[in-house]
UniProtKB/Swiss-Prot annotation:
Family annotation (Pfam families): Creatinase_N, Peptidase_M24
Name the UniProt record assigns to this protein: Creatinase
Protein family membership: Belongs to the peptidase M24 family. Creatinase subfamily.
Alphabetical list of Gene3D superfamilies matching this protein: Creatinase/methionine aminopeptidase superfamily, Creatinase/prolidase N-terminal domain
Catalytic activity: creatine + H2O = sarcosine + urea
EC number: 3.5.3.3
Self-association state and partner proteins as the record states: Homodimer.
GO molecular function, one term: creatinase activity
């Protein structure tokens, strides 16, 4: 029996898209204008973020590749048979082609069905691995493969009004997660119990806000003591002690859109040495909030904030840049690296951009005030300055939690 290489699975009805039809039409139009200007026949996206951004389909890879083929006429998602009809139900576009596991490299067969011929194909240099790039090139021996990832990132950096609304919801849900952390916090509670409580609260809040939403990827990092030394350190079984430095990190994920709340906390009391470090980091945070406005250069913001840390002899303990862009991204996809508050980024802030202000310093064990300190707010840049959409309190006056 000859089994098929590809399928169409039209199972059920199309679901309500995350954004309006006009929103996706605007995204497609901007992309197509870029393709036309660069004489690119089609874009073959492979990343979570661009496939989600242009089609509203956020795939679950599990080791399989996915794609979105965009031409001047079509938007076609390429998905694996294991997903059934879900990719078709979600895709905002003209078609969905399913590839099967019956033969090797049916993925590329599906791409060729979506794009029979092309002279110039846009790919994502920062995502498509070398093996699959070579296989794609072999399917189109006369085509030139060129990068579109950087240009698409620049398009994503300016958020629409609908995206702003989504990010506002995310910031609100993150604040709910933060409140749940404080609620669960007590002496000798394990980190994972606090994190579980916060994640459950956020997932429920997302479900209450959005109809027919896919609930995936929302998470919490709650770190205590030495575990605060890395911003992305995993949750552990460590138990919280009175006087511990604590790091609250809540990340609601809504339709692939990321938001975050991050705060330094202490349980019961805070030593004088810790308080000095904390207050210095808060000083930088507050200064940074005032610098987020149109016309400011990312590198200039970083340099100005460096001076405050220098004043406190703490610059050597800074661990990363002062903030980054938001949008369709997560801890495993979508970093908009062109919009980060770092010394090596000269991007100028514009209305519509969404950035965080999140200074962090880390003093190693054995030093007075040891631990990692971080405050994180989200700001929407507008014509007159920026709107801070994070409402959860920060600093020693509010976040020494006494129970």
């Amino acid at each position: 029996m000859q089994m098929p290489k590809t399928l169409r699975i039209r199972n059920g009805e199309k679901v309500k898209s995350t954004f309006s039809a006009q929103e996706y039409a605007n995204r497609h139009a901007k992309l197509r204008a870029h393709l036309a200007a660069e004489n690119i026949d089609a874009a073959v996206f492979t990343s979570y973020h661009n496939i989600n951004y242009y089609s509203d389909f956020l795939y679950c890879s599990f080791g399989r590749p996915y794609a979105l083929v965009v031409t001047q006429d079509d938007v076609i998602s390429i998905s694996a048979n294991i997903d059934g009809g879900q990719p078709w139900r979600r895709t905002v576009g003209t078609d969905n082609i399913v590839y099967t596991d019956w033969q090797r490299d049916n993925y590329f067969v599906a791409i060729q069905q979506a794009l029979p011929r092309a002279r110039r194909i846009g790919i994502e240099h920062d995502h498509l691995n070398l093996q699959n790039r070579d296989k794609l090139a072999a399917r189109y021996p006369d085509a030139e493969l060129v990068d579109v990832a950087a240009a698409c990132m620049r398009m994503r950096m300016i958020k629409s009004a609908e995206e702003h609304e989504m990010i506002r919801h995310g910031a609100r849900v993150a604040d709910i997660g933060g409140a749940a952390i404080v609620e669960a916090l007590r002496d000798q509670v394990p980190e994972y119990e606090v994190a579980l409580h916060a994640t459950q609260a956020m997932v429920r809040a997302i479900a209450e806000t959005f109809d027919n939403v896919e609930l995936m990827d929302t998470w919490t990092w709650f770190q205590s003591g030495i575990n605060t030394d890395g911003a992305h350190n995993p949750v552990t079984t460590r138990k919280v002690n009175k006087g511990d430095i604590l790091s609250l990190n809540c990340f609601p994920m809504i339709a692939g859109y990321y938001t975050a709340l991050e705060r330094t906390l202490f349980l019961d009391h805070c030593s004088d040495d810790h308080l000095r470090m904390w207050q210095a980091n808060v000083e930088v945070h507050e200064a940074g909030l005032k610098l987020i406005k149109p016309g400011m250069r990312c590198s200039d913001i970083a340099k100005e904030l460096n001076e405050i840390f220098l004043k406190h002899d703490l610059l050597q303990y800074r661990t990363f840049g002062y903030g980054h862009s938001f949008g369709t991204l997560s801890h495993y996809y979508g970093r908009e690296a062109g919009l980060e508050l770092r010394e090596d980024i000269d991007t100028v802030l514009e209305p519509g951009m969404v950035v965080s202000m999140e200074p962090m310093i880390m003093l190693p064990e054995g030093r007075p005030g040891a631990g990692g300190y971080r405050e994180h707010d989200i700001l929407i840049v507008n014509e007159n300055g920026a709107e801070n959409i994070t409402k959860f309190p920060y600093g020693p006056e509010r976040n020494i939690i006494r129970k």
